[in-house]
Amino acid sequence: MIKRKKNLKGFTLIELLVVVAIIGILAAVGVTAYSGYTVSAKKSTTKSIHAATMKYIAAEWQKCSMDPEGIIMVEDKATAAKQISCSTQGASDVITLLTTEANSPLQDKDPYDNGYAIVATAPTGKAVAGNVVLTSSGKVITLTTCYAINNADDGCSTAADDHKEATLTNTVTLD
């Protein structure tokens, strides 16, 4: 009787283990790359919100030079809380309007915690990143934005933390 060797088809255990190991390595690299991408996207979004807020304030206030008795930042003409008069109101009124989420024409969300991005009081700890903090002094509005928290996750990055500043500061003068 002649014995014939059956031709077995399939994968060996070693081959399967090699494939699983390769998939694990690729997944680890992918997660790390994706994590870096999301951090970068949050920083870019925060910088964009800062720039948009600054441009919005400057553009709206520029309208007052064309019509000193006009009304700006109008979202709802019927609601006085949602508008500013060029002749009687100033920097603190602009800040109050923009930082009151229900009244503000700007509805940007903080990319770090999905809260309202434009605030009048600087948050502390992890919440500091992603907010545009508006403060006033006379006719000057200062916008300060932290776009990256430090290594300890308890505040904005500084030169000592990450060897670079992670804060944007701009001013808009209301004349």
Which positions does each model-derived feature cover?
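Internal alpha-helical transmembrane segments of multi-pass membrane proteins, especially GPCRs
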Residues: 9, 15-18
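N-terminal leader/signal peptides at the extreme start of proteins
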Residues: 1-11
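Conserved Walker
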Residues: 12, 29, 44
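Alpha-helical hydrophobic helix detector
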Residues: 17-33
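Membrane-proximal N-terminal amphipathic helix
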Residues: 39-69
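Alpha-helical interaction segments
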Residues: 23-27, 50-51, 102-106
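Periplasmic/extracellular, small/polar-rich flexible segments of pilin-like filament-forming proteins
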Residues: 62-175
